[in-house]
C-alpha cells in the first residue's frame, strides 16, 4: 500500500502531517508534482516529478495507484477515478470521498464551473484552519486503522 499525494496543490502543513505519518506507519509516501519538491530524508518518502501540463500529475496517480492505496487530493475528478480503481481518497480538509458522495461532488463542481464560465464570481475555499488540519490527521489515522484491520 502507498499514499499518493497530488502535491502541486497540497498545502505544506498537510504535507508535514503526511511526512510524519509515513514514518510512523512505515508506509510509502509518493508526492507527484510538476516541479521539484523538497522532502525530508526518509526511506519511505519520495517525489515523482512529471512534465507540466493539464492533468499530467493526476493521470500519473491514476495510472500507478492500486486498490487499497490512499490518494490525497482536492481534485474531485481525480478522486472519482481513483475510487473506481479501489483506492481511498481524502482531501486536505479531511473529507473522505466515497462512492456515495463523489457523484454529488462532481455535479456541484460542474455547476460551479458553469457559473464561473458565465462570469459569476464564486470565490474560493476558505484557508485551511487548525480544525481542518486536525480533521485531516484524524481521518488519516482512521484510514490507517482500517488498513491494519484488513491486513491482520
UniProtKB/Swiss-Prot annotation:
CDD domains noted in UniProt: PIN_YqxD-like
Disulphide connectivity of cysteines: none
Annotated InterPro entries: UPF0178
Domain of life, source organism: Bacteria
Family membership: Belongs to the UPF0178 family.
Protein name according to UniProt: UPF0178 protein CKO_02784
Organism: Citrobacter koseri (strain ATCC BAA-895 / CDC 4225-83 / SGSC4696)
Amino acid at each position: 500500500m502507498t499514499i499518493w499525494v497530488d502535491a502541486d496543490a497540497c498545502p505544506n502543513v498537510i504535507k508535514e502531517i503526511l511526512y510524519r505519518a509515513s514514518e510512523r506507519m512505515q508506509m510509502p509516501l509518493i508526492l507527484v508534482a510538476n516541479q521539484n519538491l523538497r522532502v525530508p530524508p526518509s526511506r519511505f518518502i519520495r517525489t515523482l516529478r512529471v512534465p507540466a501540463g493539464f492533468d499530467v500529475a493526476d493521470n500519473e496517480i491514476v495510472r500507478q495507484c492500486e486498490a487499497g492505496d490512499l490518494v490525497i487530493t482536492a481534485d474531485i475528478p481525480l478522486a472519482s477515478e481513483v475510487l473506481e480503481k479501489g483506492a481511498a481518497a481524502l482531501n486536505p480538509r479531511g473529507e473522505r470521498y466515497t462512492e456515495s458522495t463523489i457523484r454529488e461532488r462532481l455535479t456541484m463542481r460542474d455547476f460551479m464551473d458553469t457559473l464561473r464560465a458565465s462570469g459569476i464570481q464564486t470565490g474560493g475555499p476558505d484557508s485551511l484552519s487548525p480544525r481542518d488540519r486536525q480533521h485531516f490527521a484524524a481521518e488519516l489515522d482512521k484510514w490507517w486503522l482500517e488498513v491494519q484491520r484488513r491486513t491482520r
